[in-house]
């Protein structure tokens, strides 16, 4: 039996998520078929809401619904201590630990020559500006320890 076109499209869209293969995408799609109309509408509303309301913080490039984000605008945070992460979602586990009291800077990726990602594609100019224009006493690198990480760091001229 062939999968109906609309269902196949949903499977395809789910399979575009990182780490989601065809079988998982099918399970998700089949599960949605069991949703009530209200549950389906709630999912649709949540997807629309996140696309309309979530943006990048103009200071750190983390996810936010206000600008600057709650972390960057919080007066009790140590703005001299900056934790550099690769992606906005890397902030959440650090925050969950409750240990770090500084602010963040998101690179929006990591250098990967094989994927064609060089320093120009990363958020390094903004980091350099923060270092030069703010009184930053500590820069903490919380990036993935891969062989190209050392290439991601800005150097002084």
Located regions from the model:
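Post-transcriptional modification and biogenesis factors for structured RNAs
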Residues: 1, 13, 130-134, 156
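Cys/His-rich Zn2+-binding cysteine-cluster or related metal-binding knuckle/ribbon modules and their
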Residues: 2-8, 16, 26-82, 87-91
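A generic alpha-helix structural signal
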Residues: 11, 44-47, 128-131
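Extended interfacial segments that mediate partner engagement and assembly in macromolecular machines
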Residues: 25, 74-143
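Short glycine-/acidic-enriched loop or helix-start segments at secondary-structure transitions
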Residues: 69, 94, 151
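Gly/Ser/Thr-rich loops at beta-strand to alpha-helix junctions
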Residues: 145-148
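Single conserved hydrophobic/aromatic residue that forms the stacking wall/gate
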Residues: 150-157
């Amino acid at each position: 039996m062939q999968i109906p076109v609309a269902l196949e499209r949903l499977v395809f869209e789910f399979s575009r998520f990182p780490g989601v293969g065809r079988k998982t995408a099918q399970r998700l799609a089949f599960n949605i078929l069991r949703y009530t109309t209200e549950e389906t509408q709630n999912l649709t509303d949540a997807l629309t809401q996140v696309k309309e309301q979530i943006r990048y913080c103009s200071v750190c490039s983390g996810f936010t619904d206000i600008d600057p984000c709650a972390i960057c605008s919080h007066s009790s945070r140590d703005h001299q201590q900056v934790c550099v992460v690769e992606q906005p979602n890397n902030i959440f586990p650090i925050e969950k630990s409750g240990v770090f009291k500084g602010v963040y800077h998101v690179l929006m990726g990591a250098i990967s020559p094989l994927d064609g990602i060089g320093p120009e594609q990363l958020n390094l100019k903004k980091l350099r500006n923060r270092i030069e224009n703010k009184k930053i006493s500590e820069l903490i690198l919380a990036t993935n320890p891969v062989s190209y990480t050392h290439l991601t760091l800005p150097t002084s001229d």
